[in-house]
Amino acid sequence: MTGSGDFLENLPGRWIAGGILAIYFVALGVRTVVNGRLADFTAVTWAGTTLAFVLLAIAMTVTASSATSALADWQAGVVCGAVVIAVAAVWGSAALLGSEALGPFQTMLSTATIVLVVFMMRGRLLLAWVVVAVNTVIGVIVGPLTGSPTWLNAVLPRASFTMLFIATGAALLLAP
């Protein structure tokens, strides 16, 4: 264990975190399949949702697997790109399905928020803000195309929630 006390820097901590992430993504996969079956996903919707799932799993793995507190530039680039493309794929899938219910897609959008919170805690505050802004713009542009009268409810709370965590993290990191 190193002197910094970073949970992910010690081997047992990494195994525990990896196990928790594996359980989370198995549960997310099961929930996505059940939601897709109930919502009668089309082949294109399945493809978009599967792409989002894979990209979010990659983003979380890269974010959580670094042995140091701060992520390297290439890791940050992978995470940012994966989260933005995943969010675009989720919103695009919802729009293509034309369903008024966004429920089947909420877990993926929530997972993107979780990835960004962990990303912020790994020393990438500014990039986390940029990704939140880009994801919010994607939701505002594509959200109306879903046909759901409550699409904005899926965009703004996540943006606010993520920004709250980022602001809190920034305050903690900048505090004396």
Model feature map: region roles:
Residues 96-104:
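Short, amphipathic, aromatic/basic-enriched membrane-interface segments that mark the entry/exit
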Residues 51-55, 107-112, 160, 164:
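Membrane-embedded alpha-helical segments of multi-pass membrane proteins
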Residues 27, 53-58, 82-93:
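A generic, lipid-embedded transmembrane alpha helix
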Residues 81-89, 103-141:
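Alpha-helical transmembrane segments of integral membrane proteins
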Residues 164-176:
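Juxtamembrane or sensor-core-proximal signal-transducing alpha helices
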Residues 18, 128-130, 156-160:
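Hydrophobic alpha-helical transmembrane segments
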Residues 29-49, 99-100, 138-165:
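Alpha-helical transmembrane segments and their interfaces in multipass membrane proteins
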Residues 1-70:
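N-terminal signal-anchor/first transmembrane helix of integral membrane proteins
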